[in-house]
């Protein structure tokens, strides 16, 4: 089946035959949540109370007994109507001394998605999926090699973040927390499975749920949110006008159309010049620096000449290059650039006035690093919870 997405007007492949996930309060506006409460014969403010338990205290249906401001007699109906279980953890894998955790989730219709929580000394970041699979077909990405199953709902996206916030708030590892004690989730990056801008409506609603204060959302800082895209130009321009100062990350991976057509197939539709023009418009409108994502592939896109070509495109722009040594996947024979090649690439960019750093890779051994989601991890370090 091919569907036209309302968010960008583009024809993108979707797989038919999947049921829609059940209604969840994270899918609903405040007025819609209140309407559900009144349809149950309850005062509208009961919906606000339930939403506070979810967004502020990260409570789930299993925690209904903790919602003591709700009369016990109404909890079952209210929870059933607006807090269905959308994601079930199938497997959780830890590495980096327990500071990185990948969770494999099963949706109610059996689709598989993954999220990754990473704890750093000064922050905690969760990488979330926006689709089950991906239809962009990038040959070095495990998700792209597997194809697209379906878009995620707003609530399915938000649930990944709420689970991460719940994990960070846990007091001990026995309660499901990470080593180091309780903390606060500070950053969300839409760099998991899927192309976020191909699921624009759900993405936009999810961003509002993450930013808006309780009882409408988690109250995270918009500046701690990053949306990654392979370059869906109409959607980039549309996002620029939404009034949300989130960071835009463009998965560029090549400075020229000939190579990028091979690495990022959507480039045949929106070439490098158009993608970067939209990115610079985004930076101008939002005042936010654009992150240019560039996977360093040995002998493919890591030559000094391509570093110079990339610098020529970016010099003078509000941009930062995030260089990512390619992470291995089973479907690709390409390898990461050698450390010396990485250093040379960075040095040539910086010498031409372009800010650039090499990403601190997390989770490679459990297939949780960039480009590895949906790849088979070589070591299983933790059973499902």
UniProtKB/Swiss-Prot annotation:
[4Fe-4S] cluster binds at residues 134, 138, 141. It comes from the Bacteria. S-adenosyl-L-methionine binds at residues 194-195, 228, 251-253, 327. CDD domains: Radical_SAM. The active site is at 114 (proton acceptor), 370 (s-methylcysteine intermediate). Residues 1-24 are annotated as: Disordered. It catalyses: adenosine(2503) in 23S rRNA + 2 reduced [2Fe-2S]-[ferredoxin] + 2 S-adenosyl-L-methionine = 2-methyladenosine(2503) in 23S rRNA + 5'-deoxyadenosine + L-methionine + 2 oxidized [2Fe-2S]-[ferredoxin] + S-adenosyl-L-homocysteine; adenosine(37) in tRNA + 2 reduced [2Fe-2S]-[ferredoxin] + 2 S-adenosyl-L-methionine = 2-methyladenosine(37) in tRNA + 5'-deoxyadenosine + L-methionine + 2 oxidized [2Fe-2S]-[ferredoxin] + S-adenosyl-L-homocysteine. The keyword Metal-binding applies. Disulfide bonds join 127-370. Keywords: 4Fe-4S, Cytoplasm, Disulfide bond, Iron, Iron-sulfur, Metal-binding, Methyltransferase, rRNA processing, S-adenosyl-L-methionine, Transferase, tRNA processing. The keyword Transmembrane does not apply. Transmembrane segments: none annotated. One of its GO terms (biological process) is rRNA base methylation. InterPro entries: Aldolase_TIM, Methyltransferase_A, RNA_MTrfase_RlmN, rRNA_lsu_MTrfase_RlmN/Cfr, rSAM. Residues 120-364 form the Radical SAM core domain. SUPFAM superfamilies: Radical SAM enzymes. It holds the Pfam family Radical_SAM. One of its GO terms (molecular function) is 4 iron, 4 sulfur cluster binding. It is an enzyme of class 2 (transferase). Belongs to the radical SAM superfamily. RlmN family. Reaction proceeds by a ping-pong mechanism involving intermediate methylation of a conserved cysteine residue. Specifically methylates position 2 of adenine 2503 in 23S rRNA and position 2 of adenine 37 in tRNAs. This is Probable dual-specificity RNA methyltransferase RlmN. It comes from Parafrankia sp. (strain EAN1pec). The gene is rlmN.
